[in-house]
Amino acid sequence: MARKRRQRGKRHSSKKTEDVDVSEDEFEQTEEPKLGQINKYTKEPIQPFLGVLTPEEEKYFREIEETLVSHNTRDNEDTRYLVDSIFAEVSGKELQVLNNVFGSKVLEKVFTLASSQQIKNFFGALNGSYLQITQTTFGSFVLEKLLSHMGRIIDMEEKGGALDEEEGSEFVATAESLIMYMCNELRPEISALLDHKLAAHVLEKLLLLLNGQRSVQEGESKAKYVSISVPSSFKEYAYSIVESAAENLEATELRAYSVNKYASRVIQAFVRIEFERRARSKKNKATPFSDKLLLSKEYDWKELPFVETLLKDETGSRVLEVLVERMPASDLTRLENVFEGRYYRLCVHPIANFVMQKFIKRANALTVERMLNELKDSSESLVRKSFLSVLKTLLETCNEKNFHQNHLFRLIISAAKERHPKQNLFVALLRSKHKKDKNSTDGKRVLVNNFIAVQLVEEMLRVPIELSSELIESLLELEPESIVEYATETASSHIIEQILGMSDLKMAHRRRLLNAFDGHFAEIAVTAPGSHIVDKCWFATQDLPLYRSRIVAELAEAGDEVKFDFYGKKVWANWKVELYRRAADQWYRWSKEDKSEKPIMKRVRSLPPLENTFARKRTMEPSEDLGASKKTRMTAFFGTI
């Protein structure tokens, strides 16, 4: 069969479209994605659509983001004018702005410069859209920051502080009512938000805010929670959510949420809220949520696999940490039975060791004694890198509660000597090494110490001086150049500073340490860690005026090298080196004014008052023997010799 002949040109094109009537039923109906719905391609939750900014609006917020870098306080009138103009631009399109990458950054910055009224106005404009915002990437971040600022406003309202309200403002709702609007909107969907990748973070912040804890972040550091004053209705509402979760969720569901990467954060908040309510209440001491999760007496923890899961799961261990911090003492005994016989294995486990640290902080003397007896068998491994954190916490607990300090200190010393028999004790404990300096072009090697080991040594110096003297002696056995190197290293300098500041430090040790620095004070003073060391030497030389004179003379001789250095100039000012160079006699007088009391005077003044003795009263009558000789008066005062 012959094919139809093809003709060229637009008039005869086969791609010519024809008008076809299509009914509305044939179109695919696009629905709003359901909460928790997963994209089958990206495997991520589908985010609701909140609108987009026009290219001109996006360009505006990109430029504003760069402008806000130079504005750090609201005290400037230009800053206030800029903030007002930003909120005027945002008004009416809040959802589109907070869901934009540039707009969200601008909002996070401008919240720190905004007035309380502006923040409340913005928060109120989101009413009815909180559920959608919590499910978006940028919107959830903005909402977290916004909750932190709302917490500050609530705290001020509760304490009766003056808010920076604006004149002519029409919005009169309190921060309390605004937060409750948000809670009422999210409450029906909490079960779906619990393990949502984005919403779980917002839910955690909201629950802790209701419980009186506000998230605060300074710079790039990790956010921390501070206590604030909140209405009593907030805490009752927070507990009602926890109570509802305990009633409606099965134990298996709670445990599954505990090891979920996102839901675990909310479970931790639930536990905190429940135990804090238990601490406040005088009658109701029940903890139904925690009991269903783990603490019920019906559960045999030795036979319960969930306990092992919580101990060694990266996510679940955080829930167990919160439980260990707050559980009753009777439950700690149950936990001790689980740990007995395997303290060392759990303490060196990369995840379980964090739970063990929380447990040790609450342990009593008998529990610590059992632990130490078990650790004796692994004494050589006590100073392993993986065990240092637990060892530091254990010694810290012994120092705070004043038990087993001698036992543990000797155990650490013997373990270090056994593991490194030919190495100096101080060097062995700090795990000191020399590594190539990445910032140096000549291949210079610098001292590097283990940070946790430094913290352990600091804790070891807080034991009675009779014990810590052995550690100080090992430091002083090093060459002066090595001691100077430790004094200028970021981590180990804290140890040297602590030793110099010890009030009960032996005079011989103090002199030897100061002698090690002789000739290096100027070199030490121009480093960031060393400048603190030289300042602490002022305290260490209170009873050693000759040493103090030698130090200031060495700093004065270095001159501009110290005076105009960023760190050295602070030492120069604290030691008043300029006064020493200009008028040495005045400097000596000023130095003597700071001299501490002599030990003998301290002992005399600390003596108890004399009892059953008659104090001599000064008589107003003239003495009969005004011409008594000096010898007679001295004999009368001191007695017959």
From Swiss-Prot:
SUPFAM superfamilies membership: ARM repeat
GO CC terms of this entry: 90S preribosome; nucleolus; preribosome, small subunit precursor
Main localization of the protein described in the UniProt heading: nucleus
Molecular function GO labels: RNA binding
UniProt feature, compositional bias: Acidic residues: 20-30
Superkingdom to which the source organism belongs: Eukaryota
Keyword Cell cycle: no
UniProt cross-references to Pfam families, sorted A to Z: PUF_NOP9
GO BP: any one term: endonucleolytic cleavage to generate mature 5'-end of SSU-rRNA from (SSU-rRNA, 5.8S rRNA, LSU-rRNA)
PROSITE patterns from the UniProt entry: PUM, PUM_HD
Keywords, alphabetical: Nucleus, Repeat, Ribosome biogenesis, rRNA processing
InterPro entries: ARM-like, ARM-type_fold, NOP9, PUM-HD, Pumilio_RNA-bd_rpt
Compositionally biased intervals (Basic residues): 1-14
Localization in the cell: Nucleus, Nucleolus
Region spans: Disordered: 1-39
Ranges for the Pumilio repeats: 89-124, 125-160, 185-227, 248-284, 302-337, 338-373, 477-515, 516-553
Family according to the record: Belongs to the NOP9 family.
Functional summary from the UniProt entry: RNA-binding nucleolar protein required for pre-rRNA processing. Involved in production of 18S rRNA and assembly of small ribosomal subunit.
Protein known as: Nucleolar protein 9
